[in-house]
Every structure is written in C-alpha cells, then in structure tokens.
Amino acid sequence: MRRSREFFVCHQGFPVPNANPHLYSALMLQPRMVGGLVVIGTGFQRPEVFLALAAIMAWAALVPSQNLFDALYNYTIAYPRGVPSLRVAPAPRRFSQGFAAAMSLAMGLALVAGATTMAWILEGAALVSIASVLVRRFCVPAHLYDALRRTSSSMFGMPVGHESPHC
C-alpha cells in the first residue's frame, strides 16, 4: 500500500500495516458518495439533499455498526468478492462522520432559511474538504480529532490512548 494510503488509513483510526489490502478502497467509498451528494446538493441548491445527508451521517457517527455506507460496501463489494468486510468505525472516523453531519445540517438549514450566501460558503468548504480526502488522502476532521486528543492529553496531564499508534 502506498504511503499516502497508509497515512489515510492510519488517521481513520485503523492499525497500519493492515492485513486487509482492500481497506483503503473500502474507506474511500463513503467520501466518494458523500462528495457526489454534496455536488448534487450544491448544483441544485436543494436543502433536502443536505438534510438527508446530515441524517445519514449522524446515524453513522452515533450508531457505527449500522453505517449505511459501510453496509453498502459490505453487501455489494466485500461479500460477493470474498474480501474482508468493513467493521465498526474507530473514533477518528466517527468524528469525521459527525463533522460531516454537522456541516450537512448547517448547509441544509442555511438553504431553508434563505441564507444562500452562507450556504455557498459552507458548500465550498465542504467541497474543499472532500477534495482533500479524494485527491490528497488527507481527512481534515480526522486530523482535527487527533490534534484535539493530543491537546486534551497535554492539558490534563493524562495519557490518551491512540487507536493506531503507528501513525
């Protein structure tokens, strides 16, 4: 696996090196689909798209064993091809999903409220963040999660475990 892919997998909270060579492409299904939905929502300026996405992403963050995108990957790709399925998301990935839910909710509510300038700004920020994942393999919310954990650990003098110590 390329180093940038290992970095992405590691920052999502999975151990590296990982025995599953399909993990990177499995993890990328969600940002690709979310990116497509954000492009559609932005293009048509439909709050329903963002509000539905907010609900789906919030569900993924709050009930990680029932993540719709992971289930879609498992039932359409992993099981038919006999490759390892995605398991429950580690904390950095759930934090990223929660962040996506909050952004989607903000975009949807901005459109509902008629605050189109705010909606465009939020949509632009979301598209840049998604492009960062898809092009650079760098997830801003997962990095923020890691930075917040390090900061809280040093502030309170308590060691904080890391899901993946090899990053």
Regions picked out by a protein language model, each given a short descriptive name:
Residues 1-167:
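Membrane-interfacial helix-loop segments of redox and metal-homeostasis proteins
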